[in-house]
Amino acid sequence: DGANAEATDNKPGVFERDEKKCCWNRACTRLVPCSK
């Protein structure tokens, strides 16, 4: 719990290209949900 609520070291803008990082990025999660 809280995995999607906490942002990692991902830099803003990077998550747009990397879905995996997006999965752990709060700001990105709003755009792309975390998929297995």
From Swiss-Prot:
Source superkingdom: Eukaryota
Pro-peptide region(s): 1-21
Keyword Amino-acid biosynthesis: no
Cysteine pairings via disulfide bonds: C22-C28, C23-C34
Keywords: Cleavage on pair of basic residues, Disulfide bond, Ion channel impairing toxin, Neurotoxin, Secreted, Toxin
GO MF assignments: ion channel regulator activity; toxin activity
UniProt subcellular location: Secreted
Tissue-specific expression: Expressed by the venom duct.
GO cellular component: extracellular region
Domain remark from Swiss-Prot or TrEMBL: The cysteine framework is I (CC-C-C). Alpha4/5 pattern.
UniProt record similarity statement: Belongs to the conotoxin A superfamily.
Protein name listed in UniProt: Conotoxin Bu21
